[in-house]
Amino acid sequence: MQYIKIHALDNVAVALADLAEGTEVSVDNQTVTLRQDVARGHKFALTDIAKGANVIKYGLPIGYALADIAAGVHVHAHNTRTNLSDLDQYRYQPDFQDLPAQAADREVQIYRRANGDVGVRNELWILPTVGCVNGIARQIQNRFLKETNNAEGTDGVFLFSHTYGCSQLGDDHINTRTMLQNMVRHPNAGAVLVIGLGCENNQVAAFRETLGDIDPERVHFMICQQQDDEIEAGIEHLHQLYNVMRNDKREPGKLSELKFGLECGGSDGLSGITANPMLGRFSDYVIANGGTTVLTEVPEMFGAEQLLMDHCRDEATFEKLVTMVNDFKQYFIAHDQPIYENPSPGNKAGGITTLEDKSLGCTQKAGSSVVVDVLRYGERLKTPGLNLLSAPGNDAVATSALAGAGCHMVLFSTGRGTPYGGFVPTVKIATNSELAAKKKHWIDFDAGQLIHGKAMPQLLEEFIDTIVEFANGKQTCNERNDFRELAIFKSGVTL
């Protein structure tokens, strides 16, 4: 297959391989001759499109023609512009159905925590309350790993450094504290050492007071200014924590007990054709078995938000989604930035033309499920089903937000490729087989097989098998590469 018309209403098709000028394309019993070279992932017109008329992809407008576009012409940023404006008015027009029957739930081997949560890793985490102690925390980590043969018997000891925790006010201070508190409670961590300096805004005492119930044998706190030798004190804390969690064992559980974040980064023109629809099918499978998934990257919902709104389970959920979308648009406006200048240079090089084009592909990850809840940044997941989470499109911030909400894994589709990993296993799904072959050390799964003849049901089954392996302890590429990062959303001033 060299090209695809995604929806019956489309007036463009997408090249699935590089197509040369003069290539004859047959679609709907009509033959179109390409008037220019069209790269893989890029679009070409199937019919003449008049100046000002809509360019249709996924059955919906992705922009309008800047000039007359003849059949066979390359359709991209040079001749197409977004239709989108600033704040919009929305109506609740529910349009959803029950999910069809899905394959049976799968057994996985997981860690059961005392509070009822489950984890897919048993790691010892070091969390600085403030960036000033990152170096101290690194020394503590390195010394401890040498003393314990790399924390034998666990899935590792990891430091998640950041630059925040002081000189912050308002929402930024709250976001930093909340993200770190969510990490303390994350079930992939068998134990946590929180390290403060002593004079920062993000005070350890206030952090503990607002943290809620914790197991004091598995969560320790240390303030460096109160220690004679903070390195030795920190190492002693880690030994105590290690001795508590090192004997934790996996137990049988169900895949539907896990929470999955859905994300894309470095998207291309195949993202909405291969990897994202597959993730949508996986999300439906998990949810049909009683599980939980969550979609974020709010700026990459712009242009497709009405589709998600129509899937909200009730008007209250719809209103929460409207507020989330318009609040994020207002965030752009308040900083005097254009709302719809989203597609990156890499997106455009891969064939994505407008934000509508990007968003309609991005939201394929949501599948056909009903939206059960809309969460603010820093909120934790509480309702099984498809959730939406407020966070930006930035890969690092969005991945951290998903993990902070309680996701055990983040499922991350990419067409251009990225090595990035968050603080939970970050499963990279390539939209095209060329990327999967070139970057085997980055990519965990090849969804590009769809355009080379593999049927979606078979691909989905193989993907479920892969996720079960990762849940059972097999390392993702980001884990093997030790690419584990934390990024916290910042929107305000720095003192």
Curated annotation (Swiss-Prot):
What is this enzyme's EC?
A: 4.2.1.7
| Bound cofactor: record note | Mn(2+) can substitute for iron, but in higher concentrations. Cannot use Fe(3+), Ni(2+) or Mg(2+).
Keyword vocabulary terms for this entry:
Iron, Lyase, Manganese
Q: Which InterPro entries match?
A: GD_AH_C, GD_AH_second, SAF, UxaA/GarD_SAF, UxaA_altronate/galactarate_dh
Describe the pH dependence.
Optimum pH is about 7.5. The activity at pH 6.5 and 8.6 is only about 20% of the maximal achievable activity at optimum pH.
Summary of activators and inhibitors of this protein: Is inhibited by high concentrations of Fe(2+) (> 2 mM), and by EDTA or other iron chelators in vitro.
Copy out the induction comment.
Answer: Repressed by LeuO and H-NS. Part of the uxaCA operon.
Q: List the top taxonomic levels of the source.
A: Bacteria, Pseudomonadati, Pseudomonadota, Gammaproteobacteria, Enterobacterales
Q: What is this protein called?
A: Altronate dehydratase
| Reactions the enzyme catalyzes | D-altronate = 2-dehydro-3-deoxy-D-gluconate + H2O
Pfam families per the record?
GD_AH_C, GD_AH_second, SAF
Q: What domain of life does the UniProt record list for this protein's source?
A: Bacteria
